[in-house]
A protein has these predicted regions:
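Ferredoxin-type iron-sulfur electron-transfer modules in oxidoreductases and energy-metabolism complexes
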Residues: 31-43, 90-268
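Iron-sulfur-associated redox domains of electron-transfer enzymes in respiratory
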Residues: 2-109, 142, 152, 156, ...
Length: 268
């Protein structure tokens, strides 16, 4: 029996430009888009550039745009795409500079990350840290990020308005939220959020949340709380004064009675 063949249009080119080339790929049960790209590489296009690593949806390497939607190639099933289109079009993330074919230069993200003050405990505090379980659960969602940068690619501030000089992007709102909400962190990143990081640039369309493969509620649980924190400390004079006069955070008390046990949380 002849296998059904799938039509793939794959973007080929680099920083100087390029275009789509069409390939006919035999479809097999359970095939994902990354499988199809690998078949193309093994059957006549060995020079097709494609970044990947785990093929399990955990490394974030194989990010691309599939029929215009940012997604991981290893988690996008061919049969599901074909339910809505007879052609599968694969192209690199458009918000980042092209290197070769489906490979983009995402180094800007690492430069931004270095500008964020890392986890900063109170003077004298040392790991292991004791924390209430409810405090751990507040930030565990943000720690699921695999740095696929799909949220950066879909963000209209970065994509449509080239706002890299004014906005860190959703991925780093998640990182800043994980630090700001950490019960043992004492650094004040609100001035950076208000100015350099540009949290006000986001108008909460939730497009970043929609494409996140780890289902992090980026808008609701990271960006909106950070916006509220900036508004409280930057525009409410009473809250601003009280924040600067507040005592340092006391250490979390040990669990007693029937309370849930405390848990450790790695910090980075």
């Amino acid at each position: 029996m002849t296998a059904r063949r799938v039509k793939l249009e794959v973007w080929r080119g680099g920083a100087g430009g390029g275009g789509f080339q069409t390939y006919s790929v035999p479809q097999v049960e359970g095939m994902v888009v990354l499988d199809a790209v690998h078949w193309i590489q093994a059957n006549g296009a060995a020079d097709l550039g494609c970044r990947w690593n785990c093929k399990a949806g955990k490394c974030g390497s194989c990010s691309a745009e599939i029929n215009g939607r940012p997604a991981l190639m290893c988690k996008t099933r061919v049969d599901e795409v074909l339910e809505f289109s007879s052609v599968i079009r694969v192209q690199p993330m458009r918000v980042f500079p092209a290197i070769a074919d489906l490979v983009t230069d995402v180094s800007w993200n690492y430069e931004v990350n270095r500008r964020i003050q890392p986890f900063t405990p109170a003077p004298g505090e040392r790991a292991p840290f004791l924390m209430q379980q409810r405090d751990v659960e507040r930030v565990i969602e943000q720690r699921r990020c695999i740095e696929c940068f799909l949220c950066q690619d879909v963000c209209h501030v970065l994509r449509e308005h080239q706002g890299q000089d004014r906005f860190f992007g959703p991925r780093f709102m998640v990182r800043l939220a994980s630090l700001e909400m950490h019960p043992k962190d004492v650094a004040n990143r609100v001035p950076q959020l208000h100015a350099e990081a540009g949290v006000a640039m986001c108008n909460i369309t939730k497009c970043c949340t929609e494409v996140c493969p780890e289902h992090i509620r980026i808008t609701d649980n990271a960006i909106i709380p950070l916006k509220e924190r900036v508004a409280d400390r930057s525009y409410d004079p009473i809250r601003g004064v009280l924040f600067h006069l507040r005592p340092s955070r006391p250490p979390a008390p040990p669990p007693v009675g029937s309370e849930r046990p405390e848990a450790g949380l790695s910090s980075s």
